[in-house]
Regions:
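Acidic/Ser-Thr/Pro-Gly-rich, low-complexity N-terminal segments
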Residues: 349-432
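Long, glycine/tryptophan/cysteine-rich extracytoplasmic
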Residues: 2-66, 106-111, 199-267, 306-326, ...
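Alpha-helical transmembrane segments of multi-pass integral membrane proteins
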Residues: 87, 91-149, 184, 188, ...
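N-terminal membrane-targeting/anchoring modules of bacterial envelope and secretion proteins
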Residues: 1-182, 195-196, 200, 342, ...
């Protein structure tokens, strides 16, 4: 996990030194340049002259996020304990937090000399969201399934996450193609942006910057295709209407439409077709698809937060977050509901008939006869028990003759003693 961060810091330092050398700037700006490049790489924000820029190029950030997630997945793919996960999470979140705090301190120290500022803390929280996303992706579905089994969570929740990612990846691919098509259609606006620069270095820089901002435009296109409006300061762009203002001189912005033709509303079927394709190709239960719709909406919210933000005097640039989240959920959930209903109609539940067990009815006379037979059997059993008890007593008497003789002798002795006493009493009376 330390390797991607170390490589990123090294590249940031090299890029900062190279940029200062090529622009003939003073090395006094080195610390502030390093800090701003680090925040830009982590999709945080940069500030200066009282303005905040958080609409940053997402391509370098997404590559960095992929590198961190790949390193995490390599560390946990074989075997990992809960303690190891705790240490891993602490490193994944603790290292960028420490580096971001150092970058903020460097900007604060340089603000007394240079025209730079520390970005608002709310913008810096995107750095933590960035690395949380890397941790979530790096753990992978296999580890999440193991954790679900360990803590009693339903395992189909992981299937819902996978289903949501399928939809977002397919939707993003289609949106990227639409951006390239729109750029090709508006090629005149693309080339007109570069005609104001004479030197080739500036043209190359604009093209490179457009490529770095390409994921941002792709996410904006996803929002437009789902029906959400895109705000660019006072401008509003959607498939229903377009209200434009002068945009920054960036060639990739030629992909944004300058007007909304009447047929543009038909583009709203694209996400529905994609959701249908995903649900049919990977059939899931209704509960799984509904959960996948919720996860898709939340993941798209994260993407929209990374792609948009504040852009100097334009203020907010980005999608309507509430509308985007709601529409993504509605599209996926509605398609999942329809497919589940159609599948239920095509494959109804078969109810197997249970054979009834015949019940034999007995007549009252037979019941009375059975009861009388039971009573007679009980009486016979009691008589047999009494006879057995009598026989046991007789056997005991026969087995102990000595005891009986002793008892008879003792009785005779008692009678003899009684007669002797009576004789003595009579003689005493005669003497008197």
């Amino acid at each position: 996990v330390l390797i991607p961060h170390g490589v990123a810091v090294l590249l940031v330092v090299i890029l900062a030194v190279a940029s200062l050398m090529f622009t003939n700037s003073s090395m006094v700006n080195l610390s502030a340049t390093i800090a701003q490049l680090w925040l830009s790489l982590n999709l945080g924000a940069v500030a200066g002259s009282g303005e905040v820029i958080s609409v940053l190029p997402t391509l370098p950030g997404f590559i960095f996020l992929w590198a961190i997630a790949a390193r995490i997945h390599r560390a946990v793919k074989d075997r990992v304990s809960i303690a190891d996960l705790g240490v891993l999470a602490a490193l994944v979140l603790g290292i960028p937090l420490a580096l971001t705090a150092i970058a903020a301190f460097m900007l604060f120290d340089a603000s007394s000399v240079l025209n730079v500022e520390v970005p608002p803390i709310t913008r810096l929280l995107r750095v933590m969201l960035f690395h949380l996303s890397a941790l979530f992706l790096g753990m992978g579905p296999r580890l999440w399934q193991a954790l679900a089994r360990r803590y009693g969570a339903p395992e189909w929740l992981i299937d819902a996450i996978t289903q949501a990612f399928r939809f977002l990846i397919a939707f993003g691919t289609v949106s990227l193609v639409s951006v390239l098509v729109m750029t090709a259609i508006n090629h005149s606006a693309f080339t007109a942006t570069m005609q104001g620069y004479d030197d080739s270095a500036s043209v190359v820089a604009l093209i490179v910057l457009s490529i770095l901002y390409l994921p941002n435009i792709m996410i904006f296109a996803m929002g437009n295709l789902i029906g959400s409006p895109l705000y660019f300061g006072d401008a509003s762009i959607s498939v229903f209407s377009v209200h434009s203002v002068p945009l920054p001189p960036l060639p990739i912005l030629a992909a944004l439409p300058s007007e909304a033709p009447s047929w543009a509303v038909a583009l709203l079927v694209i996400p529905a077709i994609i959701a249908t394709w995903v649900c049919v190709r990977n059939p899931m239960r209704l509960a799984v698809n509904t959960t996948a719709a919720v996860i898709s909406a939340l993941c798209f919210l994260v993407l929209a937060v990374f792609a948009g933000g504040t852009l100097g005097v334009y203020n907010y640039v980005g999608l309507n977050l509430l509308a985007s989240v709601g529409l993504v959920f509605v599209y996926f959930a509605l398609v999942g509901l329809l497919i589940a209903g159609i599948d239920k109609l095509r494959n109804p539940v078969e109810v197997k008939s249970v054979k009834a067990v015949p019940v034999v009815e007995t007549e009252p006379e037979e019941v009375e006869e059975d009861e009388e037979e039971d009573v007679e059997e009980e009486v016979d059993e009691e008589e047999e028990e009494v006879e057995e008890a009598v026989e046991e007593v007789e056997e005991d008497d026969a087995d102990d003759p000595e005891e009986n003789s002793e008892e008879e002798e003792s009785d005779e002795e008692i009678e003899t003693e009684t007669e002797a006493e009576e004789t003595n009493d009579g003689s005493e009376a005669e003497d008197r």
